[in-house]
Regions:
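GST superfamily/GST-like fold recognition
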Residues: 169-171, 207
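Acidic, low-complexity terminal tails and accessory targeting/binding regions
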Residues: 17-35, 117-128, 157, 176-236
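Generic beta-sheet signal
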Residues: 38, 157-165
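Active-site metal-binding loops of divalent metal-dependent hydrolases
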Residues: 44, 167, 214
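Active-site-proximal alpha-helix that buttresses catalytic centers in soluble enzyme cores
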Residues: 20-112, 131-136, 140-145, 226, ...
Length: 236
């Protein structure tokens, strides 16, 4: 009995129960690795019937403004520190980005033609018949240049970048990140003001985290998927 009591006293006072796990330290001499996470926002619903320059007309409809406010609130609620906000030069993208910028006023909105809507090569014959070889080549060159500019490893710290652009642009970027034939970009759709998230690791590898996530938009406010709304639209 005396031996048992002595043993228990040792365990409680300074033995097994009192022992702290050893701190786990990263190996010395190993450089930290950072990631870049890119949040691709498709613009909101817009006036497709308007005629004229896309940088002047074809602005957001009331539905599109409501969608923009919803995605802005989604972004504002994320537990990350956003580091940049870029948008296409087209009116509908600039207006959507402006709403996002109001929700995230610490960011400086940058406008770039690299994110403009365009039509790159696709397997769809019905789409290709209306395009010229020069136009297709220009679109592909633009999107490849945009991908090379924005989808690069982070330096110094984790980066969280928002790109407000267009459906064709976003889908092309997804095919590039997945390493599949970029002509497959018409094989899926992304809703207006949906979120597509792609991460770039320290070695230049890509991981697609989300495609066309529209969970922040009620079903009756969804658009841009090529189908009718499931319920009458009521502005929030």
């Amino acid at each position: 009995m005396k031996i048992l009591v002595t043993l228990l006293g040792w365990v409680v006072a300074g033995g097994l129960c009192a022992a702290e796990p050893a701190a786990v330290r990263p190996p010395t001499g190993v450089a930290p690795e950072f990631t870049r996470t890119i949040y691709l926002v498709r613009h909101g619903n817009y006036d497709e019937a308007a005629k004229g320059d896309d940088e002047v007309v074809r602005g957001l409809t009331p539905l599109g403004m409501a969608q923009a406010r919803l995605v802005a609130a989604r972004l504002r609620g994320m537990p990350v520190m956003f580091t940049s906000l870029n948008a296409s030069t087209m009116t509908r993208a600039r207006q959507t980005a402006g709403v996002v910028n109001q929700a995230l006023p610490g960011l400086q909105l940058q406008i770039t033609p690299l994110l403009r809507e365009c039509t790159p090569p696709t397997w769809r014959a019905d789409i290709m018949k209306d395009q010229t070889p020069a136009g297709l080549a220009a679109a592909e060159a633009q999107l490849n240049a945009a991908f090379a500019r924005f989808f690069v490893p982070a330096e110094g710290s984790d980066q969280h970048d928002i790109l407000v652009c267009h459906g064709n642009v976003i889908r092309y970027f997804v095919t590039k990140a997945l390493g599949v034939d970029t002509r497959a970009w018409l094989g899926f759709s992304v809703a207006h003001c949906s979120l597509t998230i792609i991460q770039v690791d320290a070695h230049g590898g890509y991981k697609v985290l989300a495609v066309g996530d529209a969970g922040h938009i009620p079903p009756n406010l969804l658009s841009g998927l090529g189908r009718a709304a499931v319920a009458p639209r009521v502005m929030p």
